[in-house]
């Protein structure tokens, strides 16, 4: 019988500067939103609202919204979770399966329920205190992925809850909700001496390799776009930006992209430092080809899981 969750690693050997570039790109660009826009609608449990919202914020939602990875990473889509659960004599706990899960199309604000794997019944979130007929505990809450804009249009789509209660409770907490995009990286990634390693979790109910490909394709496309948009100032060196003086051959490195690209072509640079280097050695298209080849190598390694 296949275990529902397995920890694995995907390892590829790359040129060290390129491996570092991919690792840093992953950590800075591949951002999976947390459920930090949370609203408790009704709570008679022994856990206070803040405890519920903290627990829900960090639900591992990628294993639920796995069919929508690319559009969530590009922020074309968001998601929400909704829980309404009462204690009973024979049902005294809450699992992730008790939530309903919805995808949000940010263009139309449409809200669509997604299927949830039965394996979520194995993930415990809360245990109620001893059941008493006259004081049964109930919790109702909703939480949106970070970056979701809460407006009248999207609220009107929440037909499964009492909109008046939602508006009242949301107005009570919206000033303390972090307005910044709050996220986490889907995996831990390291690259010691060019050994690029992804520490991943594989679940039995969906095709991890397809999901991992969505992530790497997103990363590659975003990195290539960033390379094309990257600029190095030419002229007198300016310590506020990466800059190169062709007359002296001096390069000032002030960002990670410049550092990794010039290191790929033989420089031994560090951030916020000067280096004598011939920038004519840098071939951006050659670097992009090496990046694309590395991404193919990563996907090939993932297919061996």
Swiss-Prot record:
It catalyses: RNA(n) + a ribonucleoside 5'-triphosphate = RNA(n+1) + diphosphate. Keywords: DNA-directed RNA polymerase, Nucleotidyltransferase, Phosphoprotein, Transcription, Transferase, Virion. It is found in: Virion. It comes from the Viruses. Disulfide bonds: none annotated. GO terms for cellular component: DNA-directed RNA polymerase complex; virion component. It is an enzyme of class 2 (transferase). Its EC number is 2.7.7.6. The keyword Transcription applies. GO terms for molecular function: DNA binding; DNA-directed RNA polymerase activity. Its main location: virion. One of its GO terms (biological process) is viral transcription. InterPro entries: DNA-dir_RNA_pol_35kDa_poxviral. Belongs to the poxviridae DNA-directed RNA polymerase 35 kDa subunit family. The DNA-dependent RNA polymerase used for intermediate and late genes expression consists of eight subunits 147 kDa, 133 kDa, 35 kDa, 30 kDa, 22 kDa, 19 kDa, 18 kDa and 7 kDa totalling more than 500 kDa in mass. The same holoenzyme, with the addition of the transcription-specificity factor RAP94, is used for early gene expression. Part of the DNA-dependent RNA polymerase which catalyzes the transcription of viral DNA into RNA using the four ribonucleoside triphosphates as substrates. Responsible for the transcription of early, intermediate and late genes. DNA-dependent RNA polymerase associates with the early transcription factor (ETF), itself composed of D6 and A7, thereby allowing the early genes transcription. Late transcription, and probably also intermediate transcription, require newly synthesized RNA polymerase. This is DNA-directed RNA polymerase 35 kDa subunit. It comes from Monkeypox virus.
